[in-house]
Amino acid sequence: MKSMRILPISLTIMAGLLSIEASAVEFHGYARSGIGWTGSGGEQQCFQSTGAQSKYRLGNECETYAELKLGQELWKDGNKSFYFDTNVAYSVAQKNDWESTDPAFREVNVQAKNVIDWLPGSTLWAGKRFYQRHDVHMIDFYYWDISGPGAGLQDIDLGFSKLALAVTRNTESGGSYGWIASQRKEIPTSNDVYDIRLSGLEVNPGGNLELGFDYGRANARDHYKLDRHASKDGFMFTAEHTQSMLGGFNKFVVQYATDSMTSSNSGHSEGASVNNDGYMLRILNHGAINLAEKWDLMYVAMYQDTDRDNNNGNTWYTVGVRPMYKWTSTMSTLLDIGYDNVKSQRTHDTNDQYKITLAQQWQAGDSIWSRPAIRLFATYAKWNEKWGNANKKDGYIDGMAYRDTATHKFSRGDDDEFTFGAQFEAWW
């Protein structure tokens, strides 16, 4: 009984302490979850073309995912300030009530604004951070993302544009070798990415240009070395034009990457790898616009060619649209249509898939970006695949592309499926 009396007192004290700082703490985040079924039976399946780096997400997400961000301005004096930011992410298979998981510590950093007197308007930062990520929302595809532990200085005013400088790190699971007590030992390899960006270059009315250069290199520890065939380093160049139009925007992007920067094709480096020498060329156009009073539209079209020296690259085409009709300010209907085509450099065979989703949605506002949203959806997917990547269990070369044979199928084959369900999505 004594513990029962202490509990309300403790909660009262905690509530009082929290209320003191409640106005200063900022809570942001993202979350989605739901329930779905597959027409042929069982829980909801999700569909992604083999070789494609993403999928059309509406009515095609099978997990519960959340990012919970807490931040606070810790100090402010005039226009100078220090802001502390954190982000913890969770992902589970949404199959049970209790699903234990280890959270991912995605962000913890401090951002100091205007603390360098001779660089007014700039921000100095250090720590783990989502750093100026560029993505296509409708396919959940991050095409420029060097996020990770790092440090940098951004928003340096050059008059004609803003300059940003940063260095971040990502680590490969292996790749560095050494001899310890006469035994060969492999350890993880860190990769450093150095990022330079110019943004806000006004090139036409309502249009601006952002240019970026990323150099990534593997950084092996002392007494360890990389394989002599490792790619070691690489670079990625990005040019992105953003045009304000029709109550929204259009982004046209050209990217070129080499060697270690072609593993993820987004800005992370894998210089210890022995199979990523080559280049990547990406041409991307995407946006979201208002077509009429009751119509909004998202769209994407992309060409991506990853050419490997070991002949294990691929060429990926994708095109999709998501029109939205607004019945009221809080109710809408969405149709999501997407097509993927991926050709193997090694086998010269093609995998293709199209996916169609019809969703009835209730959302907090009349924009295609309005969230939270609750939607009921029905999805149909049809695919025809002729190649896939082997794994160690197959007895073939791990990660290498192979054509389907009469005795072994590497791909998903030729099939279709129907799913339906309900989902919420929120960001704040």
UniProtKB/Swiss-Prot annotation:
Disulfide bonds: none annotated. Its main location: membrane. Pfam families: LamB. GO terms for molecular function: maltodextrin transmembrane transporter activity; maltose transporting porin activity. Induction: By maltose. It catalyses: beta-maltose(in) = beta-maltose(out). It is found in: Cell outer membrane. The record marks 142 as: Important in sugar transport. The record marks 30, 65, 98, 249, 369, 427 as: Greasy slide, important in sugar transport. The keyword Transmembrane applies. It is a multi-pass membrane protein. SUPFAM superfamilies: Porins. Residues 1-24 form the signal peptide. This is Maltoporin. One of its GO terms (cellular component) is cell outer membrane. Belongs to the porin LamB (TC 1.B.3) family. Keywords: Cell outer membrane, Ion transport, Membrane, Porin, Signal, Sugar transport, Transmembrane, Transmembrane beta strand, Transport. One of its GO terms (biological process) is monoatomic ion transport. Involved in the transport of maltose and maltodextrins. Homotrimer formed of three 18-stranded antiparallel beta-barrels, containing three independent channels.
